[in-house]
């Protein structure tokens, strides 16, 4: 048989397989989520996220040191405040948990890249992502507090903000606030296509951010929709976003691909808590090889078109990249 084309030629050895990889990964493209609890001293394991921790303000640099030891130089900060109220006033307080954490991290590790999550759900006593009018979130009033919160983060030293609230017009409101207060060069990572997903459960337990009534389907996206994600991304581009995001990742690879093809901005994907917890649970039950599944799922997200990935596996993936198992 005279076979001219033999694809197996490029699969014969590890060296040639690595040479011909189409998808390349780097630890520079990994972002590690860090949970900072204002009421905590030291470190406390997160029950709903095995292998992850809450850090107190006195131990948050430990999280940074651990990240750096694996080659991770980017984090996204989530805060758990002592005080919650109807308007989430702790979110923009000068001595708020995120503001203190940012100052502490940047004082100790000025080159470590700190992204802050901007939302109200961890700070409101009702757990919704904005200011309520009855049982509805008032979009435009919420823009005011989101802008105020984002400004307080960058004033404390944050390198980038990531608004996750899904209010209409929030990118424009924050961009205008930054530009008028001397932060025109501070980038915004927009949670552009954030779906009302069932995969957020472990995070909401870890962050204490579950809504006390109702759900978030009135502002987060319907999982049935794909074209709407392009509309949301286009709006964020027009409002001044610097980076777009799709969240969750694994169940929305088609959306990542669509957004990658449609827009030139860098694209982030968030591999959320439920994705992480599923792998952990399946591994604990002896059903899958955790390491291989971790690597394969991350590859699928980058192969779909993501430029960067927020993941609870960031440190482990960085180690896998160093070993040459992926990347």
Predicted ranges, named:
Residues 13, 26-31, 38-327:
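Alpha/beta enzyme core
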Residues 1-21:
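N-terminal amphipathic/basic leader segments beginning at the initiator methionine
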């Amino acid at each position: 048989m005279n076979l001219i084309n033999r694809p197996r030629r490029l699969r014969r050895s590890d060296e040639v397989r690595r040479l011909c990889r189409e998808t390349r990964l780097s630890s520079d493209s990994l972002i590690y989520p860090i949970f900072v609890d204002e009421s905590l001293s030291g470190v406390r394991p997160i029950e709903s996220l095995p292998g992850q921790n809450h850090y107190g303000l006195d131990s948050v640099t430990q999280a940074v040191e651990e990240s750096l030891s694996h080659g991770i130089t980017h984090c996204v900060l989530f805060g758990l405040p002592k005080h919650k109220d109807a308007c989430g006033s702790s979110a923009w307080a000068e001595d708020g948990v995120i503001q203190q954490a940012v100052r502490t991290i940047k004082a100790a590790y000025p080159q470590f890249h700190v992204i802050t999550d901007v939302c109200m759900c961890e700070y409101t006593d009702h757990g919704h992502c904005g200011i309520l009018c009855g049982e509805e979130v008032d979009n435009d009033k919420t823009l005011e507090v989101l802008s105020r919160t984002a400004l307080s983060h960058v004033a404390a030293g944050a390198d980038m903000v990531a608004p996750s609230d899904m209010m209409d017009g929030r990118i424009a409101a924050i961009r205008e606030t930054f530009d008028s207060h001397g932060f025109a060069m501070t980038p915004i990572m927009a949670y552009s296509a954030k779906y009302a997903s069932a995969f957020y459960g472990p995070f909401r337990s870890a962050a204490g951010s579950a809504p006390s009534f109702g759900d978030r389907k009135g502002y987060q996206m319907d999982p049935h929709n794909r074209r709407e994600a392009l509309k949301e991304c286009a709006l964020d581009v027009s409002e001044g976003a610097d980076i777009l995001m799709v969240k969750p990742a694994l169940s929305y690879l088609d959306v990542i691909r669509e957004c990658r093809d449609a827009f030139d901005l860098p694209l982030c994907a968030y591999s959320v808590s439920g994705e992480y917890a599923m792998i952990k649970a399946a591994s604990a039950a002896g059903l899958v090889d955790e390491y291989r599944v971790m690597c394969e799922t991350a590859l699928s997200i980058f192969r779909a078109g993501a430029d960067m990935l927020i993941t609870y596996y960031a440190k482990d993936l960085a180690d896998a990249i160093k070993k040459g198992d992926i990347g």
